[in-house]
Amino acid sequence: MVNWQVIGQLLSATLIVLAGPAVIFVLAFKKGNL
C-alpha cells in the first residue's frame, strides 16, 4: 500500500528546496543582464 500523503509531502518539500535557489538565480541572472 502506497502512502500518497507522505509522498506528496516529500515532493512538495523537494520542490520548495529546489525552487528557492532557482528563483534567486533567475532574479540575479535577469538583473545582471539588464
UniProtKB/Swiss-Prot annotation:
It is found in: Plastid, Chloroplast thylakoid membrane. It is a single-pass membrane protein. It holds the Pfam family PSII_Ycf12. InterPro entries: PSII_Ycf12_core-subunit (IPR010284). GO terms for cellular component: chloroplast thylakoid membrane; photosystem II. GO terms for biological process: photosynthesis. Its main location: plastid. Keywords: Chloroplast, Membrane, Photosynthesis, Photosystem II, Plastid, Thylakoid, Transmembrane, Transmembrane helix. The chain crosses the membrane at residues 6-26. The keyword Oxidoreductase does not apply. A core subunit of photosystem II (PSII), probably helps stabilize the reaction center. PSII is composed of 1 copy each of membrane proteins PsbA, PsbB, PsbC, PsbD, PsbE, PsbF, PsbH, PsbI, PsbJ, PsbK, PsbL, PsbM, PsbT, PsbX, PsbY, PsbZ, Psb30/Ycf12, peripheral proteins of the oxygen-evolving complex and a large number of cofactors. It forms dimeric complexes. Belongs to the Psb30/Ycf12 family. This is Photosystem II reaction center protein Psb30. It comes from Heterosigma akashiwo (strain NIES-293 / 8280G21-1). The lineage of its organism: Eukaryota, Sar, Stramenopiles, Ochrophyta, Raphidophyceae. The gene is psb30.
